[in-house]
Structures are given as C-alpha cells and as structure tokens.
Curated annotation (Swiss-Prot):
The gene is cca. PANTHER family: MULTIFUNCTIONAL CCA PROTEIN. Disulfide bonds: none annotated. It comes from Pseudomonas aeruginosa (strain LESB58). It catalyses: a tRNA precursor + 2 CTP + ATP = a tRNA with a 3' CCA end + 3 diphosphate; a tRNA with a 3' CCA end + 2 CTP + ATP = a tRNA with a 3' CCACCA end + 3 diphosphate. This is Multifunctional CCA protein. Gene3D superfamilies: Beta Polymerase, domain 2 (3.30.460.10), cca-adding enzyme, domain 2 (1.10.3090.10). Its cofactor is Mg(2+); Ni(2+). Catalyzes the addition and repair of the essential 3'-terminal CCA sequence in tRNAs without using a nucleic acid template. Adds these three nucleotides in the order of C, C, and A to the tRNA nucleotide-73, using CTP and ATP as substrates and producing inorganic pyrophosphate. tRNA 3'-terminal CCA addition is required both for tRNA processing and repair. Also involved in tRNA surveillance by mediating tandem CCA addition to generate a CCACCA at the 3' terminus of unstable tRNAs. While stable tRNAs receive only 3'-terminal CCA, unstable tRNAs are marked with CCACCA and rapidly degraded. A single active site specifically recognizes both ATP and CTP and is responsible for their addition. One of its GO terms (biological process) is tRNA 3'-terminal CCA addition. Monomer. Can also form homodimers and oligomers.
Length: 410
C-alpha cells in the first residue's frame, strides 16, 4: 500500500502558491484494507475514504471508461492492481496529473512540470474529449492562472472545440454547469473564462445570448472598444479588479444581452435594449438554475443600468420609482450591488477605466435619504392602509427633492 499526494496540491506547491486542499491517492490497497485501518467510506460512485485523524480524502487508484453521454457517463474500476500512472492518466490536464510520494519526490509521467514551466494548459490524453465538463474546467483554470502567463495549448483548444461541436455539452446538468461557471467568475481573470469558451465554440452552446454580443458594434463616442462582447469582457475584468461578489459579476455578464437582438440596420444604436434583454436574462437564469439572489440582481441590472448612468439627470419621482423597484427599504444591499454593477459597466470601456463615477455616491445618498423617512409620524396622525402608503410615498418624494436640490448646490 503506497500513498501519494496528487493533483492541485502538487501543482500549487510547484507554482509557489498556497496549498489549501490536499487530495491523496492510495495504490495497492482494497476497500477492506482501508476500513481495517480506520478510514471512513464516503464515495458513492467510487471508493473514497476520510482519514481517521485529518479528515482528508483518500481515494483508491482507479481507471475509468466512457459508458454514456455527459459528465456522469463513466464506469469506474478500482482495485489494488491499478497503478499510479493509470490513475493519473484519467486526469484532465498534465499540470494536474502529477503526484508526490512520502519522501517529497514528484512523479510526473505526462510532462506536467514542463508545462508548468511553459505556462501551458495541456490535456493528458485523447480521453479528455470524453468528458464535456472539462471544457469548463480548462477555461476556469485559464481564468485562474492567466496572471501567471498560462494559456490553453492549441491542441487542447482543438479538443475543446471538438467537444463543443459534438453536442456533449448539452448533457451537462444545470447544477454542474453553474458550479463551474460560478467558480470561474470568481477567479482573478473571469473575462479569460468567457474568452476561452468563445474561442472554442462552447459559449455558443452554453450561453448563446452572450456569444451573440461578439461582433455587435456600439457607438464609439460612449464605447471606444466598440464591440459589445469585448465590452462585457472588460466589465468582468473590472469586477475582479474591484473584488465584486458573484451576484455582481453574474449581473455584469448578462447586463447587455438585449444588444444582441438589435437589427444590423439599427447599429450601432440599441434603443430599449434594457427591457428587450430581460426575457433573455430570465432564460439564462432558468437554464442554469441560478441562485435567487443572482437571478434577481441580473434581471434588475439588465433593466435599469442606464438609469444609473443617468442618475444625476433623473427627476425625483423617477428616482423614487427606481428605489421602489429594488425594494430598497427592506433590501438595501441589493441596491448597493446594483450601483456597483452599474459602475463596473461604466468602467469597462476602453480608456475610461479610471474615470470617476459620481452616479454611485449620488444614488447611494438618494437611497439613504429615502430610507431616512420615518413612518412613525404618519401613523401617529392616524393614517393607515392605502392612505398611509400614499402619504409615505409623498414624504419620500419630498426627501428626494430636497436631496437633489442640496446636491445641485454643492
């Protein structure tokens, strides 16, 4: 029985990065032997055990064979006869197919160290093309390590393109797809994730609404980058730079979907793209069963982001309607995230990344002014029901008028 550290822990140590999770593979052992040593079984599909002291995962060396469509279409075989090299060959990338023995020696049968040096994300074997989830995983690794100079090897990108064309991506479950997408959006360079999917044809299969934005022009006066797809990539880059949460990053990815519906005759203008994009945002949210907070923010940002850009020009009653659309009195954080997404949109323009966005402070101040209105004096007057609601609305409108006038003097 031999135990090896495998995968990400070996890769990250060699890259000089912090090692957080450690995976282990056990060669030459059976399930009965693991149980006899006090390991606790947890694997439903193949033999994985928890160490009795550390709680870390130890998996028996195994091989896998394609037996059906999709991520789950594999038959696994684990036995004491399976070698370390056989176990490593089923892994996705060479940089993830290295092991380390108990003396700290690296076992690298597929050239992972050379690819680390060359900054290449390269598949281990042609079996890579049997698992559609690997398209998303490789794009996610590209987003994680882009800052270190990593790129996807040309031959691996070709296999990813083959997978995209095969229709296998449609076999991915919404949950698995969302897990990879959400993790990728939180990487240091989420725009690289979308770019890689675009380059290999997978974006057209998974989120055709975003793919449709590439090649669609915008007015150069407002968008020096012109291409809407390029703009979305730049907005995601700003999200990472400003450490925005997942909900903001997801909303920014989808905020301009309506521009993909504009007829070429109307280019580069995109009249009413905000409202036209809402059904597309809803469709993408439903496709991946996106968490409710991300769904709601994406929908609201898509519909109202141009309101944010024009915030300083909005009349008090329009401003009040905007605040009420976000239920800012009970859910202030959602409005704050909307403002953040709108600012990322404004900054995601070529050459304008550092431009001030005074609309952010103005909108947050307006929300504070409206929320500061107390209902108590109105209740004490004996108002209730619809009458109370109307009086509260009038009081908030008055507060916003005063706020706008005060800001106008500043």
């Amino acid at each position: 029985m031999q135990i090896y550290k495998v995968g990400g822990a070996v890769r990250d140590r060699l890259l000089g990065r912090p090692v957080t999770d450690i995976d282990w593979v056990v060669v030459g052992a059976s399930s009965d032997e693991m149980l006899a040593r006090g390991y606790r079984p947890v694997g439903a599909d193949f033999p994985v055990f928890l160490h009795p002291q550390s709680g870390e995962e130890y998996a028996l060396a195994r091989t896998e064979r394609k037996s059906g469509r999709g991520y789950g279409g594999f038959t696994f075989h684990a036995s004491p006869e399976v070698t370390l090299e056989e176990d490593l060959t089923r892994r996705d990338l060479t940089i993830n197919a290295m092991a380390e023995d108990e003396q700290g020696r690296v076992i690298d049968p597929y050239g992972g160290q050379a690819d680390l040096e060359a900054r290449l994300l390269r598949h281990v074997s042609p079996a890579f093309a049997e698992d559609p989830l690997r398209v998303l995983r490789v794009a996610r690794f590209a987003a994680r390590y882009a800052g270190l100079g990593f790129r996807v090897a040309a031959e691996t990108l070709a296999l990813m393109r083959q997978l995209a064309e095969s229709g296998e991506l449609q076999a991915l479950t919404p949950e698995r797809s969302w897990k990879e997408i959400s993790r990728a959006l939180m990487e240091p360079n989420p725009e690289v994730f979308i770019q890689v999917l675009h380059d290999c044809g997978a974006l057209a299969e998974l989120i055709p609404e975003v793919e449709a934005l590439f090649g669609v022009p915008q007015p150069a006066a407002h968008h020096p980058e012109i291409d809407t797809g390029v703009h979305v990539l730049s907005v995601l880059q700003q999200c990472a730079r400003h450490r925005q949460p997942l909900s903001v990053r997801w909303a920014c990815l989808l905020h301009d979907l309506g521009k993909g519906l504009t007829s070429e005759a109307d280019w580069p203008r995109h009249i009413a793209h905000e409202t036209r994009g809402v059904p597309l945002i809803d469709a993408v949210n439903q496709r991946f069963r996106v968490p409710r907070d991300c769904q709601e923010l994406a929908r609201l940002v898509g519909e109202y982001h141009t309101h944010a850009h024009r915030a300083l020009e909005l009349r008090p009653n329009t401003l009040l309607e905007l605040l009420q659309s976000f239920d800012v009195y009970r859910r202030p954080q959602r409005f704050e995230e909307f403002v953040a997404a709108s600012e990322m949109d404004a900054r995601g323009r070529l050459g304008l990344e550092q431009r001030d966005y005074p609309q952010a402070a103005y909108l947050l101040g307006a929300a504070q002014a409206a929320r500061a209105v107390s209902v108590k004096p109105l209740v004490e007057k004996g108002l209730k029901g619809a009458e109370l609601g109307e009086a509260l609305k009038c009081a908030r409108l008055a507060a916003l008028k005063a706020y706008k006038e005060e800001r106008g003097k500043a």
